[in-house]
Amino acid sequence: MGCGKSCIGKILSEKLGFKFIDLDIWIEGQEGRSVRRIFTENGEAGFRRIETAALGEVIEEEGDMVLALGGGTLTSAAAATMVHERTRCVYLKAGIDTLVFNLTNWPGDRPMLDGNPDSKTLSRRIGELMSQRESTYGRTAHIILDIDGKDYDTVSDEIIALAHILDS
C-alpha cells in the first residue's frame, strides 16, 4: 500500500508490451461498486473472498500482463499460493518513511487507512500492516526489490533485468 505498484506497473507494462491490470479496478468493474463500498457492505473478509476469486479469474483469462495487487491481497493464503505458483511475483519493498510520504502526498481512497490519520498515526498503522504482511510477501515473491529512493522508471528497469536473470 503506497509503494507505487500501479504507477510502476503501468511503466513496466509499456516497456514489456503487456497489458496492465490493477486488480482493485478490475474488481470494481466486475462488481459495479467501489472497493470502499465492498468493504463497507461486505467487510474486509467479504472483500478478500471477492478479491481472491477475481485474482483467479484474471490469472486464468488475461494472458501476458502486469498485474498490480492490493496491499492486502496476499493475506489470503489461497491468493498467495495462486500468485506464487502461477505468476512471477515482485515485492516492491519500501520503508515506512517512503510509504508514509507517498500516502500523505497521494492518499487515494484506501479503506484500510480510514480516518485521514496524521503522519504519526499513519506511520504506526503502516508499521502494523508491514509486520503482519512482510513474511507472506517474502514467501510469495520471486523477486524482492528495495525501492526506497528510486524513481519508477529505474525500478521498472531493475524488474526487467531481474526477471531476465530468473529466466536464465
Please give the residue ranges for each predicted region:
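Short glycine-rich anion-binding loops that position phosphate/pyrophosphate groups of nucleotides
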Residues: 71-73, 95-97, 150
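NTP-dependent small-molecule kinase module
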Residues: 15, 101, 131-168
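Walker A/P-loop
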Residues: 6
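Short, well-ordered alpha-helix to beta-strand connector turns
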Residues: 62, 86-87, 140-141
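A glycine- and Lys/Arg-enriched "phosphate-lid" helix/loop adjacent to the NTP-binding pocket
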Residues: 85-134
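Walker A (P-loop) phosphate-binding loop of P-loop NTPases
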Residues: 2
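ATP-dependent small-molecule kinase phosphotransfer cores
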Residues: 22-84, 127
